[in-house]
Amino acid sequence: MAALVALCSGIGRKNLTTAAGCFTDRGTQAVSVIWRRCFSQFEQVTSNEDLPVPMENPYKEPLKKCVLCEKRVDYKNVQLLSQFISPFTGCIYGRHITGLCGKKQREITKAIKRAQKMGFMPVTYKDPAYLKDPRVCNIRYRE
């Protein structure tokens, strides 16, 4: 029994890979159990049949691209700028509505303000000439 305690006291050490224990069943025959840390009783699989198949993520949404990232925004292009203001109040739509990136949203806002100050665009409403233009963004108006 002292040999068993001496052997099992070293189980916590990192370099020990084998441990043996003796168990007796009512004083009859001793059974020894051998445990090895990095070994299993099954053979290692050398083929790739159990590995997962590499594939694209089917739930990944396509990246949203900014509509105006490759375009130049000018304060004199009133028809383009009027797409980003409300037809009823003249308020500039935010990023969550227009879907623009932050840089282009700032450029659009500055261009609209500049066009309104210079008299190219009305301030309080959208110009009626541009009400039936095709929409650049997915902006839904109440009807």
From Swiss-Prot:
The keyword tRNA processing does not apply. InterPro entries: Ribosomal_bS18 (IPR001648), Ribosomal_bS18_CS (IPR018275), Ribosomal_bS18_sf (IPR036870). One of its GO terms (cellular component) is mitochondrion. GO terms for molecular function: structural constituent of ribosome. One of its GO terms (biological process) is mitochondrial translation. The keyword Cell cycle does not apply. Signal peptide: none annotated. It is found in: Mitochondrion. It comes from the Eukaryota. SUPFAM superfamilies: Ribosomal protein S18. Keywords: Mitochondrion, Ribonucleoprotein, Ribosomal protein, Transit peptide. Coiled coil: none annotated. Component of the mitochondrial ribosome small subunit (28S) which comprises a 12S rRNA and about 30 distinct proteins. NCBIfam families: S18. Belongs to the bacterial ribosomal protein bS18 family. This is Small ribosomal subunit protein bS18m.
